[in-house]
Amino acid sequence: MRRVLVVRLDSDGDVLLAGPAVRAVAAGADEVVMVVGPRGQQAAGLLPGVDAVEVWRCPWVDGEPPPVTREGTEEIVDTLAALGADEAVVLTSFHQSPLPTALVLRMAGVGRITAAPGCSTT
C-alpha cells in the first residue's frame, strides 16, 4: 500500500487551495494523509482524496509558535514515523521554506520528499 503525506501547515484557506494538488496525489496513492496546522484542520477534512488528517503545530509556521525543543521535535518525528509514509509532498507559500519540514520528514523515515513552494505573483 502506498501512503503519501501532503503537508500544508497554514490556515484553512491555504489548505483549501491545496485541493488540486491533493487530488493529483490521491490519484496515484492508496492512502493520503494530510498534515496540517491547527488552523487548517477543518479545511483538510473537507478535501476530496484525504483519508486521514494529522495536526502539527509547527514552530516555524504557526502564528503563535511553541518553542522549538528536542522533545517537541522527537514527538513529531515519532508521530510521522508511525504513519509509515512512503512519500511526502510539502506545499508552502512563497515566503516559507520547505526545508525544515523536509528535514523532519526525513528524520521520520520518509524515503521520497517533494517540495512545491508557492510563488509570488508580484
Where would I find each of the regions flagged by the language model?
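Catalytic machinery of carbohydrate-active enzymes
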Residues: 1-122
